[in-house]
Amino acid sequence: MVNRFSRRQALQAVTAGTVALSHTGPAAAEQPAAAEQGEGACVLMAEATEGPFYLDPKLERSDITEGRPGAPLNLALTIIESGPCTPIASARVDVWHCDADGLYSGYAGQGAKDTSTKGQTFLRGTQTTGSDGRVTFETIYPGWYPGRTPHIHVKILLDQKTLVTAQMYFPELLSRRIYGERDPYTTRGDAPDTTNSNDGIFKASGGESGGVMLAIAGVGDVLTGSLVIAIDRSRTSAQGGWMQWLRGKIGPN
């Protein structure tokens, strides 16, 4: 018998493992309305540029922190088929994001100090969905860098085919509170210059109605970000990376 997610069950999948948490600390006041997450649970996730910092180190692991400092964040993602709302098993889920200083692992020439992280693999990892379509990651709340609102990249593959490349986002007020109250974000000496409301990639993904907003719950110092990601297994991702996206904006070099 095929297991199908109703809208109610899809919503429950979003909040699985978080509903029992007492909402204290910075996440409490910023949790998105559950009904909003549930209504869009079976709607295709909007794609977004892969960005310039994707790597495929084939790191099959749930804890991707590698000791990087920051506010603890657990990711709970559920991958489902958009039409019937059925969980997708054996899908590979890649996630990657910057650290509290806005740096990605594995690349040179980053930031105002031209920092190199080549040879490092922090804040990257891969998990494979089980029969329930779920994966979890232990990470930290991402920092910021010029021109972008805080986000986490995600890529989903099935049978060696990339089905979707996207980015996941946070409630704006929560980011402000984390960055204003928690180390090491408070010691950076600069401030974010971009929010959800003026981030072009966020808006191009449909904004808060694009199925890209993480539902946040928390207890104490630990946050949990949950999202049901609906995909169409018959499609192939149209996002081939940062340069492909850039050429689409400015034309051939």
Regions found by a protein language model. Name each.
Residues 13-16, 27, 155:
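Alpha-helical and His/Cys-centered functional microenvironments
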Residues 27-29, 35:
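Boundary at the C-terminal end of the N-terminal hydrophobic targeting segment
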Residues 63-66, 213-217, 222-233:
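Extracellular beta-sheet/turn segments enriched in Thr/Pro/Gly and aliphatic residues
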Residues 154, 212-213:
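Glycine-rich, charged/polar anion/phosphate-binding loops
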